[in-house]
């Protein structure tokens, strides 16, 4: 379970939103909605431990009984998908995926896991491809699998569907939510689009 207790973000002593309390169970997708500038992305940055120091914060972030507030970003075991896929342009598709794998996984197993991930998203045979040669929908799928290969314990979604066209958006949404359920990941989606919130099927909170 991902649990937020009395989370508050302020900048220059001005609160971005009222104190936030929520619980997200394993395999559940909870949506946080609100207009641009209300603090949705800042909330996710705070959860990840990457919020700029200009913000003042309070409250507790708890994941599976671990308090995350004082942990470094890489110790929090949170996966995040952004609006942009953020694939490394100097690495192949396969190398992008392998980058996320824990160091304890060695060469042959790494290759097998990368190929399995590509097969799972219907991109078999694209291991050596340049990410720039992929379509937007293909890049989005690779970004999702890279996030999951890092073995996160919760998933954060920062409007990852917003730059896709309507057809791709619906298909990618289904894929992301299906993997959240399959991997039993507490998932927090921030969006301004009611269609995303409806598709998530979980609780909806407005900032």
Each language-model region and where it sits:
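ABC-type ATPase nucleotide-binding domains, specifically the catalytic core motifs of the NBD
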Residues: 52, 72, 91-111, 120
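ABC ATPase NBD coupling module
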Residues: 66-82, 103
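Conserved ABC ATPase "signature" region
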Residues: 67, 108-126, 177-178
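Conserved ABC ATPase signature
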Residues: 130-134, 138
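Hydrophobic anchor residue at the start of the ABC signature
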Residues: 144
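A short, proline-enriched helix->beta-strand linker immediately N-terminal to the Walker B motif
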Residues: 149-153
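Catalytic Walker B motif of ABC-type/P-loop ATPase nucleotide-binding domains
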Residues: 155-159
């Amino acid at each position: 379970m991902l649990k937020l207790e009395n989370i508050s973000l302020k900048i220059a002593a001005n609160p971005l939103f009222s104190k936030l309390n929520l619980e997200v169970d394993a395999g559940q997708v909870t949506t946080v909605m609100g207009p641009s500038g209300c603090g949705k992305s800042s909330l996710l940055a705070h959860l990840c431990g990457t919020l700029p120091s200009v913000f003042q914060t309070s409250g507790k972030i708890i994941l599976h009984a671990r308090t995350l507030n004082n942990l470094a970003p890489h110790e929090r075991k949170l996966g995040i998908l952004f609006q942009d896929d953020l694939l490394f342009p100097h690495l192949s598709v396969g190398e992008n995926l392998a980058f996320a794998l824990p160091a304890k996984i060695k060469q042959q197993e790494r290759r097998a896991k990368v190929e399995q991930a590509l097969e799972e998203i219907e991109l078999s045979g694209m291991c050596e491809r340049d990410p720039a040669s992929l379509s937007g929908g293909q890049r989005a799928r690779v970004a999702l699998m890279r996030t999951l290969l890092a073995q996160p314990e919760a998933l954060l979604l920062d409007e990852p569907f917003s730059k896709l066209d309507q057809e791709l958006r619906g298909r990618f949404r289904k894929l992301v939510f299906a993997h959240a359920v399959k991997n039993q990941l507490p998932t927090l989606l921030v969006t301004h689009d009611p269609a995303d919130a409806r598709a998530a099927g979980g609780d909806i909170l407005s900032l």
